[in-house]
Amino acid sequence: MAIKNRVTEMLGVETPIVQAPMGWIARSQLASAVSNAGGMGIIETSSGELDVIKEEIKRMRTLTDKPFGVNIAQAFVRDPAIADFVIEQGVTFVTTSAGSPTKYTAQLKSAGLTVFHVVPTLQAALKAVDAGVDGLIVEGSEGGGFKNPRDVATMVLLPLVRSKVDVPIIAAGGFVDGKTMAAAFA
């Protein structure tokens, strides 16, 4: 069943489900399954060299004709040319995380890519919007990855960020069933 909102319209997907870019797991097999189901599959770039990631992107294109994206986890970038590489691969959607939204946003956007940045706080959300991102991924303490012990829950952070910014938002962390997902849309 298709669900229309700002995220689905911006990303060209049927459902507002965006797969997490989990290290070592978010490769073409998982990402293509998510994209083929109508969501946004994401290939992670933090656990492989660029030639491995390039092969995953090539394989992705044989597994789906649906939209997909790539994540750049800045704290784990192995090659400083990662943004150039992503642009050269013809990817149209990038999520950035684990670093400053100012690092790659202008370069990616000037090449025509849509950029969302993962934020764990209101301050980070405001900084990302100021940097020009197209949207935010608001991830509370329940989300995966490295966490700060002062992080707050997604359902506390989400309405706060939503009240202060006017860009599309993807909620991340703590969604385990349809009821918890529906709460994020409220």
Residue ranges and their predicted role:
Residues M1-P168:
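Active-site entrance/lid segments in N-terminal catalytic domains of soluble metabolic enzymes
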Residues A182-A186:
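A compact, surface-exposed functional segment
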Residues I170-F175:
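Glycine-rich beta-strand-to-loop/alpha-helix junction loops that act as flexible
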